[in-house]
């Protein structure tokens, strides 16, 4: 499936879709944060916001998978290694917080 999508759309269009989905993930995450904090009310329920976030994450992941299987624009192994470094750095920062 990924190959057919890539063949029909091409690299630029898939990258544009990835950017659009990233924006939608950000919006859904912000909506969920508002619900969790109970500040700045929204008409969405927790379950609705969760479903929206899951859907947007799935859309984003589909774009990444299409690129991963069809394009050499990035290397997933490098991304995995970078993710490990970034996760460790994030935890280190949290553990070294003052207060």
List the model feature ranges, each with a label:
Residues 1-57, 61-99:
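Flexible "arm" and connector segments at domain edges
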């Amino acid at each position: 499936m990924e190959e057919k999508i890539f063949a029909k759309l091409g690299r630029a269009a898939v990258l544009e879709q990835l950017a659009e989905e990233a924006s939608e993930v950000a919006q859904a995450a912000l909506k969920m944060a508002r619900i969790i904090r109970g500040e700045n009310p929204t008409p969405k329920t927790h379950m609705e916001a969760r479903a929206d976030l899951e859907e947007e994450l799935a859309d984003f992941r589909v774009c990444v998978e299409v690129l991963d299987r069809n394009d050499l624009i990035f290397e997933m192994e490098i991304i995995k290694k970078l993710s490990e470094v970034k996760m460790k750095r994030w935890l280190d920062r949290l553990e070294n917080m003052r207060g």
